[in-house]
Amino acid sequence: MNKGNDKLVERLRSNTERGSILWRLVRPVVRPVWSLIHNRDYVSNYDRDYYLYHSCVLPPRELRGRLGVSFLADGFYLESGIAEARRLAARLAYSKSSLVVDIGCGLGRLATGMLWEFGDVQYFGIDSNPTFAEWCQEHIERNHPSFRFIHLDVVNELYNPTGKIDGDRIRLPLADATADIVYLWGLFTNMGPEHVRIYVSEMSRIAREGSRIFLTAFVEENVPEVSFIPKGYVPYECVKPLQCVRYSKEFLFSIFSRYGLVVEEFRHHGGAFPSQSEVYLRKEKVAA
């Protein structure tokens, strides 16, 4: 990444760490209100179901709060999306002809950053949360049709517990070898190993030969292959097993290798969020 974006990411990381510390201090007082916001059902007839910030359409804070307390701040949400868009150009060989596939796109944070940086380009976002996908379709895709969003009704304990598709039967709605960049921010941090294997297989299937893949995960050396909510690992409260899933580096990297994905760079705890590591992959070219 370029130096300017590195500084932006570092500032976002510092803000996240400070926010996590502050949240631990004030949580006993505000937790009832936070629980209400976090668990409330989305109502489509809000007087205003979006925010305008520096001429950008942002999701309402009621929805952003479900992704993490840091995203409640308009500036943080937008700047973090811009930083991720710049990562595409600086590290993942992005060009305006690239098709970017965002698996676990949430509320379109990357898409918002891409619109800021690049304008109307090719983007395909997938998420298991129907409310998130609906908001993106209404407020991003509707005005920018080259940005497409779909709801994949796969079961997810955190975001879509009533889903109809089991993760073992997942197939991404894209043809083989169509994606130039596959992006998975924070997906494997909340996913068990049986489903990680399926998603790695699928992202390898849809990626073109030589294409780039970026993801974040909780990864450490000299730890068990898989740990659900390892004690003291993240600075926020976890009450469900999938709120923090940590992998051993050897175990996770062996899955990548099995499906023809080469690790180009691993940045331990390099992400803007506590304990998340960054992994840069390349889809191997098949020898003629």
Where are these regions (language model features)?
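A short glycine-rich, Lys/Arg-flanked "PGG" loop and its adjoining helix->strand segment in the class I
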Residues: R197-E209
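Conserved S-adenosyl-L-methionine
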Residues: G104
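Short catalytic micro-motifs in class I SAM-dependent methyltransferases
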Residues: G186-L187
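Helix-capping/helix-break motifs at membrane-protein junctions
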Residues: G192-P193
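A conserved beta-strand element that flanks and buttresses the S-adenosyl-L-methionine
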Residues: Y183
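Class I (Rossmann-like) S-adenosyl-L-methionine-dependent methyltransferase catalytic domain
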Residues: N2-R91, K96, L107-M114, Q122-R171, ...
